[in-house]
Amino acid sequence: MEIHRALSSEHYSCSSYLTGHSHMNDEGGMTKEKLLSFESVCREHGLSITPQRVAIYKELISSAEHPSAVTIFNKVREYFANISLDTVNRTLLTFQKIGLAKVVESSGDPKRFDPNLEPHHHFRCIRCGKIVDFKSKSYDGLEIPPELDNKFVVMEKIVHLEGFCDKCRAR
């Protein structure tokens, strides 16, 4: 398995990072399943499975937030001191292009990345920036206006709501 080789390679001095840290521990096989999918998708697109890519992907899928490149960079550089923010950002954008992540953009904020590839929508707090995933059949069923339907092919419906989260609303 290529991921195992990447993690155990002599160039990867922190394999315990990916296997021993509690925030990286697997719940119900999900991380292992996602890593196998990661390996398969990378191979399909001709990408090498490097320890840095594995670390970036594991940070992304283990995050309860929708992390920015800076957030992931700050975590990964603890283990890869020479990794650059540009490398992390380009890697995350590559993950988006090959279908391993989605980009969540909002007005004026840096791009945030979402490993949840299932259909869902987002709520973003305009004060603290927290992003929460939610599902809604009514939003999924939104009708496409005829003026758009005649000119475009809609591939995905994503609703992005903005407001105040419960903590910020209480302030």
Regions found by a protein language model. Name each.
Residues 49, 63-68:
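Short capping segments at the starts of secondary-structure elements
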Residues 97-171:
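Non-DNA-binding regulatory cores of transcription-related proteins
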